[in-house]
């Protein structure tokens, strides 16, 4: 019978932090606010387990659709399909304006 290997399967290198960046992330990442329509990058912080999106969405860029409690809804395009990722603010980075 097949077994599940957990949500963090095959993330040994993907979720690694640099040696000097290890430990908890700063509080400012937890309290950052976003506006609906703002572009954000999904950058998973492995030291924060709550609100962590699935590993497939690491590195993708999406648009904030809304908020529910402490989590944010991020709309992304995955292989031509529109999907909604639910993640906490520790796993999101605002996109810098290129203009």
From Swiss-Prot:
Domain of life the protein comes from: Archaea
Keyword Ribonucleoprotein: yes
Keyword Acyltransferase on entry: no
UniProt record, GO biological process: translation
Any one GO CC term of the record: ribosome
Protein keywords: Ribonucleoprotein, Ribosomal protein
Coiled coil: none
PROSITE patterns named among the record's database cross-references: RIBOSOMAL_L21E
GO molecular function: structural constituent of ribosome
Range of residues in the leader sequence: none
Entry-linked NCBIfam families: PRK04306.1
HAMAP family xrefs: Ribosomal_eL21
Membership in a protein family: Belongs to the eukaryotic ribosomal protein eL21 family.
Protein name as catalogued: Large ribosomal subunit protein eL21
Organism: Methanocella arvoryzae (strain DSM 22066 / NBRC 105507 / MRE50)
């Amino acid at each position: 019978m097949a077994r599940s290997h957990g949500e963090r399967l095959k993330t040994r290198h993907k979720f690694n932090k640099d040696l000097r960046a290890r430990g908890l992330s700063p509080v400012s990442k937890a309290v950052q606010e976003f506006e609906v329509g703002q572009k954000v990058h999904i950058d998973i912080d492995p030291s924060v387990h709550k609100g962590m999106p699935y590993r497939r969405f690491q590195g993708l860029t999406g648009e904030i659709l809304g908020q529910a409690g402490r989590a944010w809804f991020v709309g992304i395009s995955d292989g031509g399909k529109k999907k909604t990722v639910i993640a906490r603010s520790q796993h999101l980075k605002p996109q810098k304006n290129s203009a």
